């Protein structure tokens, strides 16, 4: 059932290949990945760009995922009725390629050495959501999320029972471990499980592995404990793919896929599958996607904040800053980014805790280059004091 459902899509992409190549320059991916077609934007004063539809935009320099999504979007004129296919298959490409080992199988093993997956797809027309969290033994996370959206009245399925649902829908169960993920886990355990996500437990999590038990510690000390064992979030950790596709009729889908935080406590769910945290879409306004320290970001629903800021009149770049500044007010060591796009295709981004944040854009533009990489300079600690 699962294979049959996607054979038609594969056929459409092949059929459109020759037509697409007649209108699209051949791409040297080595060149495109290193390309900055737009001067780096400083997020504290960035102007929003674009305004052309249809479009696909995604986090990080995941160019292949964007390029496939763009081709699928162009199966029909103006991308009509293809935004869901574009986002799902674009993110699937990243899952298959194990982008930065932070998306898909074989990356970010938890404390027990297991890789689990989170993913979401949101329809900006109906406001329907399909998501999976802690998905075990199924590689096609965002395709399973699509089945949650299309075949259930629920929004999120989690854990083993999400895997059972996937199998009932025709997905194959298989190990998500690879020699690389096993080696990553063994290296971590050999280093006394450092760093990790525990606090206020014994034995001391900063120097030893568990099992841990809670200890009676004054609540005022938790920040000190957190600092000793906290991860450096950024490249190669928490690099969720978030993708937005908009067609010429302003129909929007937004989606995410991630294998979560490396060496997370088993059972942990990040921001990626949470509507308003990992992604949010509303045809009346636009959409936003986020990436970074999900445990912190999900507490602020930054993609919902960005969409609502655009609804209130802010430009996309300004809207992306809203959540970033609010988070950084409370968490000075936080690291993350938000991309915001309005319904007309204007886009902007903001980031914090990094030097620069790359993203990939495809739209009808003066350069006529699909899947071009752009970047934004990140807000510094001093700039972040002006909270929106």
Curated annotation (Swiss-Prot):
InterPro entries: Ntn_hydrolases_N, Peptidase_T2. Belongs to the Ntn-hydrolase family. It is an enzyme of class 3 (hydrolase). One of its GO terms (biological process) is protein deglycosylation. It holds the Pfam family Asparaginase_2. Its EC number is 3.5.1.26. This is Putative N(4)-(beta-N-acetylglucosaminyl)-L-asparaginase GL17147. Residues 1-20 form the signal peptide. The keyword Signal applies. Keywords: Autocatalytic cleavage, Disulfide bond, Hydrolase, Protease, Signal. Heterotetramer of two alpha and two beta chains arranged as a dimer of alpha/beta heterodimers. GO terms for molecular function: N4-(beta-N-acetylglucosaminyl)-L-asparaginase activity; peptidase activity. GO terms for cellular component: lysosome. Cleaved into an alpha and beta chain by autocatalysis; this activates the enzyme. The N-terminal residue of the beta subunit is responsible for the nucleophile hydrolase activity. Disulfide bonds join 94-99, 193-209, 351-378. CDD domains: Glycosylasparaginase. It catalyses: N(4)-(beta-N-acetyl-D-glucosaminyl)-L-asparagine + H2O = N-acetyl-beta-D-glucosaminylamine + L-aspartate + H(+). Cleaves the GlcNAc-Asn bond which joins oligosaccharides to the peptide of asparagine-linked glycoproteins. The active site is at 240 (nucleophile). Substrate binds at residues 268-271, 291-294. It comes from Drosophila persimilis.
């Amino acid at each position: 059932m699962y294979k049959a459902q996607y054979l038609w899509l594969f056929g459409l992409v092949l059929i459109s290949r020759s037509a697409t190549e007649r209108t699209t320059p051949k791409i040297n991916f080595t060149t495109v990945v290193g390309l900055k077609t737009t001067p780096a934007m400083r997020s504290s004063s960035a102007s929003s760009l674009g305004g052309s539809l249809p479009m696909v935009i995604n986090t990080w320099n995941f160019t292949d995922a964007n390029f496939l999504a763009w081709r699928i979007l162009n199966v029909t004129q103006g991308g009509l009725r293809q935004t869901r296919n574009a986002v799902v298959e674009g993110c699937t490409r990243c899952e298959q390629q194990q982008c930065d080992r932070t998306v898909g199988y074989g990356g970010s093993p938890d404390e027990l050495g297991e890789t689990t997956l989170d993913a979401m797809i949101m329809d900006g027309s109906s406001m329907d959501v399909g998501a999976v969290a802690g998905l075990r033994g199924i590689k096609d996370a965002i395709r399973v999320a699509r089945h949650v959206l299309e075949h259930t009245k629920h929004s999120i399925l989690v854990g083993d029972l999400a895997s059972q649902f996937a199998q009932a829908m025709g997905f194959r169960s298989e190990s998500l471990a690879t020699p690389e993920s096993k080696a990553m886990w063994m290296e971590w355990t050999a280093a006394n499980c450092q760093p990790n996500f525990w606090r206020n437990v014994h034995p001391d999590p900063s120097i030893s592995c568990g099992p841990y038990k809670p200890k009676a510690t004054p609540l005022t000390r938790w920040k000190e404990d957190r600092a000793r064992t906290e991860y450096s979030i950024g490249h190669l950790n928490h690099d969720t793919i978030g993708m937005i596709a908009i067609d010429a009729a302003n129909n929007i889908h937004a989606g995410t896929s991630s294998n979560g935080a490396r060496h997370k406590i088993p059972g942990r769910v990040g921001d990626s599958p949470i509507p308003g945290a990992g992604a949010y879409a509303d045809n009346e306004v636009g959409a936003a996607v986020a990436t970074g320290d999900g445990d912190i970001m999900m507490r602020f629903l930054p993609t919902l904040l960005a969409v609502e800021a655009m609804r209130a009149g802010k430009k996309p770049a300004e809207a992306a800053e809203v959540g970033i500044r609010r988070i950084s007010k409370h968490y000075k060591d936080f690291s993350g980014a938000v991309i915001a796009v309005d319904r007309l295709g204007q886009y902007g981004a903001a980031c914090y805790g990094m030097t620069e944040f790359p993203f990939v854009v495809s739209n009808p533009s003066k350069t006529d280059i699909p899947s071009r990489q752009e970047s934004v300079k990140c807000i510094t600690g001093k700039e972040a004091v002006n909270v929106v």
